[in-house]
């Protein structure tokens, strides 16, 4: 519950963090890419709610996070021919996402 409150406060005080102009390409910082890679290792199929939370924490729109995961899965599909991955979304809790972000900040 506390973590949800923190996310709400971040979004409330910085609504521009998740906004961009339509059609504008989102350039990701090294920090953002590192967080996305670590979350991908935890689950290559995060739920939409997870994507919203990740987006708030690293200043990307949920759609930009979604596209990044789609592209990463597509790239890995070519590398992992014959490896069968489950297609369903896997929820990871917000605490896990927060600890990934915190560990990346220290990195």
UniProtKB/Swiss-Prot annotation:
Cellular localisation: Nucleus
SUPFAM superfamilies noted in UniProt: Homeodomain-like
One example of a Gene Ontology biological process annotation: cell differentiation
InterPro entries named among the record's database cross-references: HD, Homeobox_DNA-bind_prot, Homeodomain-like_sf
Database matches in CDD domains: homeodomain
Gene Ontology cellular component list: nucleus
DNA-binding region as annotated in the record: 21-80
Pfam families in alphabetical order: Homeodomain (PF00046)
Keywords: DNA-binding, Homeobox, Nucleus
Any one GO MF annotation of this record: RNA polymerase II cis-regulatory region sequence-specific DNA binding
Name this protein carries in UniProt: Homeobox protein HD-7
Taxonomic lineage of the native organism: Eukaryota, Fungi, Fungi incertae sedis, Microsporidia, Unikaryonidae
């Amino acid at each position: 519950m506390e973590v949800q409150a923190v996310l709400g406060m971040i979004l409330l005080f910085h609504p521009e963090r998740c906004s961009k102009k339509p059609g504008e390409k989102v350039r990701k910082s090294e920090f953002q890419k590192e967080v996305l890679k670590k979350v991908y290792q935890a689950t290559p199929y995060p739920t939409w709610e997870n994507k919203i939370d990740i987006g708030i924490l690293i200043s990307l729109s949920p759609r930009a996070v979604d596209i990044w995961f789609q592209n990463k899965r597509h790239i890995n599909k070519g590398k992992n021919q014959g490896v069968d991955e489950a297609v369903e979304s896997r929820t990871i809790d917000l605490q896990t996402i927060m600890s990934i972000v915190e560990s990346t900040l220290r990195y």
